[in-house]
């Protein structure tokens, strides 16, 4: 499946606050993410708590041990809504 991507302002705000090393690691992981956001290397999984809050299925993908990107699907469009530590959805 070919995916389209869109990022919210909140995502870019959070991305800009990340240390340079995490930004670099995120860019590397996005190369995989853009091919398939559900690639097994990313450990993408549903987040029940956020899904209930947003009224749609919300997912998180692991960039590194304590860095996640939070997103949802809108048809074939992947909408990234935030990036940060695991605390984003705890």
Set out the residue ranges of the language-model regions.
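Enriched for short, Lys/Arg-rich terminal
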Residues: 2-4, 10-17, 56, 60-90
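Short helix-coil-helix linker/hinge
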Residues: 19-21
């Amino acid at each position: 499946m070919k995916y389209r991507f869109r990022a919210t302002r909140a995502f870019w705000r959070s991305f800009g606050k990340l240390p340079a090393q995490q930004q670099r690691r995120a860019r590397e992981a996005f190369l995989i993410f853009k091919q398939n956001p559900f690639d097994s290397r990313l450990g993408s999984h549903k987040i029940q708590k956020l899904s209930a809050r947003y009224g749609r299925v919300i997912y998180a993908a692991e960039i590194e041990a304590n860095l996640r990107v939070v997103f949802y699907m809108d048809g074939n469009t992947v909408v990234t809504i935030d990036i940060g530590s695991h605390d984003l959805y705890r």
